[in-house]
Amino acid sequence: MKSTSAAAGRAAAGPRGPAFRRVTLISVVVCVVALLQACAGEARRDLPPWVSTQAPAAAPMHIRTLGPDQQFSELAADTVARRLSVDASAGSLHILALSGGGAFGAFGAGALVGMSQAGERPDFAVVTGVSAGALIAPYAFLGSSWDAKLAESYTSGSAAHVLHLRALGAVFGSSLYQGAPLARLIDQYVTDDLLQSVAAEAAKGRLLLVATTNVDSGEPVIWDLGSIARYGAENAHVLFRDVLVASASVPGMFPPVVMHFHKDGQTYDEAHVDGAVTLPFFVAPEFAAVAQDGAPQRGTSVYVLIDGSIDELPQATRLRTGSIVSRSVATGLHMMMRTTLELAGTTAAQHGVRLEYAALPAAYPQHKAFDFSAANMRPMFEYASACAERAHLWTVWSQDSMASAVVADGSRAVPCPADDAAIERLARAAP
């Protein structure tokens, strides 16, 4: 009897038993998921031949705008530099670079408002932005008269509901969260009044530049939003908004923004995502392009406003997949930011350019990059504003020795970014 029962059990577990059925069910589910995933994505046109057959060549930065036919065209960096040469030679050229950082954009927004309140905010001839910095950039470009709108966007809680999960979005779509809420939020602030104001300032020769990442070519794309705004047509308004949405679309979290264009009688498209994928921040035009006849531009000042920190406090990482991946990604982003900052500081010194930078101290108590609630962002905004008002926001990167951080008023009374030991160590480590 025992042998008969054992044989029956083995038969049940055989080719048609429960174990077999479970394996079959799992295999079917995996195949269906893979098939649906392959079919669910948005249909894409073939890549342009110059993208699919050629590796990117090292070349001077080109800045994209709209051409007279409302199609994309590029503006060479040396042309941009010539616009600014008068300001540079007069010793009044100020450049602002705003980094990415998600909800940490509240730090950058508060810093600008605080500078205005202290009467210490320069008139920036060039404003560049990446990701969260791209969303701040138009207000930084327009100046203190737009501070109320800037403050509202980061303290009112209007962004609190931007994260809407997609049903099985990570498996069947291009992102975990819906893209429409982010686009609606940005569209709410990209008004006709804002575009007209940007266009008026751009007409004076000032530059508003924002970076996205072309995921097809793997390269950053710099957009001249001032020139785009000057066209004033409806598709210019849409492109202005779409560039901002793309620059803030963290891959995997939000879907890419697909932009269509025509060339040589053919229609192509490009998928653009967060500019911070390729550029933590950028200074434009290149220092060498601004310099005239190789002469140092000692009247040029660059301000790098980092929406987040450039260092991490040591901590014991849980030996779990999620914790290890999260910590590793954060460490990589911090190192990328530090490396870019060191390169910018070194290059600035070589060309006689003054560079100052500010970042959220590593010891700041709340680090929630994707918590867009007012409860998370308002304290950061107010913190940065207070530090700016008290002249403790910026660390000066000395163009002579680059050996230590210098605070403008020499005081260490307020525990603000310029007092943070981690930032000072970075400055001392510079060659």
Write out the residue ranges for each language-model feature.
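C-terminal motif of bacterial Sec signal peptides marking the signal peptidase cleavage site
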Residues: 35-38
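N-terminal secretory signal peptides that target proteins for export/translocation
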Residues: 1-21
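Sec-dependent N-terminal signal peptides
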Residues: 21-31
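Short, intrinsically disordered or compositionally biased N-terminal tails of bacterial proteins
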Residues: 2-3, 27, 246
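Catalytic nucleophile serine of serine hydrolases
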Residues: 102, 130-131
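Patatin-like phospholipase
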Residues: 40-125, 141-431
